[in-house]
A protein has these predicted regions:
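Positively charged n-region of N-terminal signal peptides that target proteins for export
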Residues: 1-4
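A structural feature that tracks compact, well-ordered secondary-structure segments
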Residues: 35-36, 53, 66-69, 79, ...
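Glycine-rich beta-strand-turn "strand-cap" elements at beta-sheet edges
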Residues: 23-31, 64-76, 99-136, 166-178, ...
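Bacterial N-terminal signal peptides
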Residues: 7-17
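Acidic/polar helix N-cap motif
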Residues: 42, 84, 140-143, 176, ...
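Short, surface-exposed ligand-recognition loops at beta-strand->loop->(often short) alpha-helix junctions
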Residues: 35-48, 138-147
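Surface-exposed interaction/gating patches
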Residues: 127-168
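An amphipathic, aromatic/His-enriched active-site/gating alpha helix that lines ligand/cofactor pockets
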Residues: 52-65, 81-114, 159-166, 185-220
């Protein structure tokens, strides 16, 4: 089962050729996903190198957040959020980022970037999550507009009203706008389960039964994720 989930996730998120980075919709931050995995024996070195790269990015002007984690198969996925494409380009040209990126790429057996558009980025101002929870959802194109309304309502309500829900972040693939990548940050497992059992998710889940045609849940290892404190909207 684990192998099947890994293959599905890799096929959907990594199996794409590197896509050109395009600007997100107007008034939305610029986002992209970066994915890394190491050859056997290089795992710890790559973890350290990716951490250094993400720190360099977060210290760059115009970078709002870099959130992510490592799954049970050693694949690291990070959502990079910038104020706009200009900030993205400036960060990539930074000497600190270029040096850190070169080291990470040297150690990575696989490195992919996925062009994405920010759909909805809901976040509290402060907090630390136990890990990043991720999901990939494929939506029936004929029901895409209806799905977006249901998802946006659930995200906004949960982050505003549920104490342990720190951030719910949704992006869509630029090349396939009916494919959603979700990154969710909860204070702990109790907060996550309270959200799943709560009214907002239950209403959402009931409404989308015929809208979601495929779903992959990505299980990440425990890894503290601290909110950047920056406005993501």
């Amino acid at each position: 089962m684990k192998k099947l989930l890994f293959c599905a996730a890799m096929m959907l998120l990594l199996g794409l050729q590197a896509l050109p980075v395009n600007a997100a919709a107007a008034a939305q931050p610029f986002v992209r996903w970066s994915v890394y995995s190491a050859a056997a024996g290089n795992e710890n070195s790559l973890r350290a190198a990716v951490a250094a790269l993400n720190t360099a990015l977060q210290n760059s002007e115009g970078v709002l957040a870099v959130y992510g984690g490592e799954d049970e198969n050693g694949v690291m996925r990070y959502l990079e959020i910038y104020t706009d494409e200009t900030a993205f380009n400036a960060a990539q040209k930074s000497s600190n980022v270029k040096t850190a990126a070169a080291q990470a790429l040297k150690l990575a057996q696989v490195h992919k970037t996925l062009a994405a558009d920010a759909f909805n980025l809901q976040s509290k101002n402060a907090g630390t999550a136990d890990k990043a929870r991720m999901a990939l959802l494929v939506i029936d194109p004929a029901q895409l507009d209806a799905y977006k309304k249901v998802l946006a309502k659930e995200m906004q309500s949960a982050v505003a009203s549920e104490e342990g829900v720190l951030a719910l972040l949704a992006t869509t693939e630029t090349a396939r706008p009916n494919v959603f990548h979700l990154l969710e940050l909860y204070a702990d497992d109790n907060a996550y389960r309270a959200h799943i059992d709560g009214p907002y998710f239950q209403e959402y889940n009931k409404a989308v039964q015929t809208m979601v045609t495929d779903k992959v849940l990505i299980v990440n290892k425990p890894q503290a994720v601290t909110l950047s404190g920056k406005n993501l909207k």
